């Protein structure tokens, strides 16, 4: 259909979208090899990096897609350099590390605490690395974090965003499904999926379901338009604020709904749909049709933009992709197309795409965030691809949209025996 075509899907523009390489693993391998060579030359110097937002998932995904062992070797190399960050009394990692010398610490603005999302968003990658190398140390480090968090897990499943790496206890801080909290909850569900939903990973699902009850307790509805939104919590008070970052939640809820019984599954899926409607309207209620960074909700006024920049974030289109695949409702494709057209109109420039300093005026900034290529465009690509392309039955996406192959139970013989590498199955049009 005409609405799904664009000049950015042909010619030289296709090379800017990593989704282009999903069906071309050899070109992916060549592109990523150049990146790896350049990046590791930089990392060999005194580089201070976050243990969270790195490329281990991208390297493992490239290995799964291409079968080229260079990516597995480099994933192991960089992870070995990161491991000193986990050498804390509690096992909760520091969030910054110098890769050349292995010295780790937390940023000053957290008062020495570790960030929940940073500490709880390596499990997929580290488990996958142990599966593919046969070395259990990576999985052990990641799962020790979850064991520590289980000790302090509250009855509502909602953890504050700051955790003390020495005592392993939660510090008084905000509870949110937005910045610094989000992907911890996402990974509880996805590790359960990665583990083939077996008894061995049942505790991840149980923790996730507990947290979803907590999410329900944070959910309110606006007037007059009945938009559902997820509050933040500070102490005993709820704040009527929702980050666009929290718009990953509808997709997460939809992905996890089928694990419940029929009645609860319907409730969770309906909430996913309602939250997706809200997130779509984050976009539709501004003059540029692009969402602000966060929104505030006031009685009788529905929603209002808080921080008014847009930096090309992927969370809403991510959820639309999940909901389209899991419901078959093409409304989610229509909504995704509207968002893509708004990016084309407001953010497209000759050399790429840029964010907006203000979604009300349309004033542009001068930066294309890397996640626009890695996530936003990839999820849009998948939103308009058959569900067999990177099928949910065979793959699980990490929080940076890198697909990791799910190792079948018959091949997952336990850590210590490397799993065999599969040939990639190409998705076929329906």
Question: What do the predicted segments below correspond to?
Answer:
Residues 2-430:
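Glycan-recognition and catalytic cores of secretory/periplasmic carbohydrate-active enzymes
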